[in-house]
Amino acid sequence: MSLPDKAFPVSWDQFHRDARALAWRLAGLDQTFKAIVCITRGGLVPAAIISRELNIRLIETVCIASYHDYVNQGDMVLLKGIAPELAENGGEGVLVVDDLTDTGKTAAQVRTMLPKAHFACVYAKPKGVPTVDTFITEVSQDTWIYFPWDMGFTYQEPIAKGAR
């Protein structure tokens, strides 16, 4: 697998700080959330952090696969839907959490299931920004974010080509 020109590696410490910043931002809203629906798999880690910080005990998952080869976003496959009681009233009072909105396709699909829910993610790319209500950090569309759960310790090429 070749590395993209723009890589944004995120450490566990950085992700934890960013997820807590998202929790702070959500806590500042004039809204009470009765449940979190996390988009798996990326939403699992931020949902755990946010649920702790906001004391939300009810956590549900919606399982959608879109990155089948870890490089290119493909067709959306719904692997597991949302509990019917959380979808009542359009998902009002539900917080949907993901790690990233890239093209916005995944969030848009979940939004059809929960049109009144509040959508939050840690990172956003320009095409995905319109599909979420709250996020922390925006990166360019051509940047690939390397999340800590996807990485091991390996050599990284310098940003400047030929600089060693």
From Swiss-Prot:
Coiled coil: none annotated. Homotetramer. One of its GO terms (cellular component) is plasma membrane. Mg(2+) binds at D99. Purine salvage pathway enzyme that catalyzes the transfer of the ribosyl-5-phosphate group from 5-phospho-alpha-D-ribose 1-diphosphate (PRPP) to the N9 position of the 6-oxopurines guanine and xanthine to form the corresponding ribonucleotides GMP (guanosine 5'-monophosphate) and XMP (xanthosine 5'-monophosphate), with the release of PPi. To a lesser extent, also acts on hypoxanthine. Guanine binds at D102, I145. GO terms for molecular function: guanine phosphoribosyltransferase activity; hypoxanthine phosphoribosyltransferase activity; magnesium ion binding; xanthine phosphoribosyltransferase activity. Xanthine binds at D102, I145. Keywords: Cell inner membrane, Cell membrane, Glycosyltransferase, Magnesium, Membrane, Metal-binding, Purine salvage, Transferase. This is Xanthine-guanine phosphoribosyltransferase. Belongs to the purine/pyrimidine phosphoribosyltransferase family. XGPT subfamily. It catalyses: GMP + diphosphate = guanine + 5-phospho-alpha-D-ribose 1-diphosphate; XMP + diphosphate = xanthine + 5-phospho-alpha-D-ribose 1-diphosphate; IMP + diphosphate = hypoxanthine + 5-phospho-alpha-D-ribose 1-diphosphate. The gene is gpt. 5-phospho-alpha-D-ribose 1-diphosphate binds at R41, G42, D98, D99, L100, T101, D102, T103, G104, K105, T106. The keyword Transcription does not apply. Its EC number is 2.4.2.-, 2.4.2.22. It holds the Pfam family Pribosyltran. InterPro entries: PRibTrfase_dom (IPR000836), PRTase-like (IPR029057), Xanthine_Guanine_PRibTrfase (IPR023747).
